[in-house]
Amino acid sequence: MSEKLSFVSPTANSPWGTYLSQVDRVVPYLGPLARWVETLKRPKRALIVDVPIEMDDGTIAHFEGYRVQHNMSRGPGKGGVRFHPDVTLEEVMALSAWMTIKTAAVNLPYGGAKGGIRVDPKKLSLQELEKITRRYTSEIGIIIGPHTDIPAPDVNTNGQIMAWMMDTYSMNVGGTATGVVTGKPLHLGGSLGRVKATGRGVFVTGREAARRLGMDLRGARIAVQGFGNVGSVAAELFAEAGAKIVAVQDHTGTIVNTNGLDLAQLIPVANKEGVVAFKSGGDIVPNEDFWNVACDILIPAALEGQITAERAQKTTAKLVLEGANGPTVPQADDILAERGVLVVPDVICNAGGVTVSYFEWVQDFSSFFWDEDEINVRLDRIMMNALNQIWDTADKHKITLRTATYAVACERILMARQERGLYP
């Protein structure tokens, strides 16, 4: 009998609670491997660190940091690092678990990990940001490495943060270790195509889902929540395919134009000031009205838990593409399924980022780098192969794409765990 974890008390709609619910749903499809399922309901390792730095005004500030390695049965841990004032251990645990599922779903030789610091980076100077990054890297350095756990960018982190992390780790081990992180600048071993990879993956899976639904992308109405690298890139690619982006929401507010927003003008403004600064391009509406906008495709590409049961009842979308991690709570998932709304789940839909991170890692070890066309061809092939296998599983068992994705991924993870056995 396995005891429940003592250090978290998840609710049904909390990130960890959502993840546990998703795992429970696939147990009937695991056969004899189900005896190992408890392995997926607890992290392998959870590290909490104190991150003290001297601020520009001379005061000493302390920040709380985390690195969680959920499961590494199939390979090194892989997952991003986020800087956000609301980061919690439970959230990082869930994100690391979703990385375990995600890497297995697209059949990459990784496990799942995630990290974060409870900090608002917008309130830090560049010097303070570098200090907190380097101190955090030093604190988690005991468990990360090119063959053990490879961080990457996530919310409020970028290539510069990864460069500082790589340099700090390298200084501590006495040699340049470019493979310790991915999402690096190109001249430090980064990969072409990495910045747009997650958004491209959303487009590739969404295009195939629309085809299977008989939905013509030409003229299709799309609403996008979150307009960073994921949301904006996906929006651009869908617009190029003939779709209309009728609503966009970011941290500043919501803009709507039923005739389609002009992305060529919106994106530069949004990157600098947020979407509400583009007042001439559409109507600024209350944030909750975003969920009432008439659309064919909904792309949640912000944070977790955005599609609640109430919002699932509101949306007119026939297709939901989860660009964010964990954007749909379990009750909302059930409502969408009952309403006949197809959901392409996060653990396959937004796997483009980790796939190109894998390409970067491989290129770093070989010191041989591919051009962007080759990156995109390989990315599209991996995403389509994974989606087709998941779709076949869903059709075979008459289950949702999310449950099918978890069934495929969990079988791979637990088979690896069973074949490796327990030591000692």
Identify the residue ranges that each predicted region occupies.
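Short, Gly/Pro- and small/polar-rich lid/capping loops
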Residues: F7-D50
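Adenosine-phosphate binding glycine-rich loop
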Residues: F7-S14, A209-A210, Q313-P424
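Flexible, glycine/charged-enriched surface loops at secondary-structure junctions
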Residues: L33-T39, N107, I144-P153, G175-G179, ...
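Glycine-rich, N-terminal phosphate-binding loop and its surrounding beta-alpha-beta segment
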Residues: V49-P121
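Glycine/serine-rich phosphate-binding loop and adjoining beta1-alpha1 elements at the start
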Residues: H84, T103-R218
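Glycine-rich phosphate/diphosphate-binding loop of Rossmann-like nucleotide-binding domains
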Residues: G190-A294
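Rossmann-like adenosine-cofactor binding region
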Residues: G253-V343
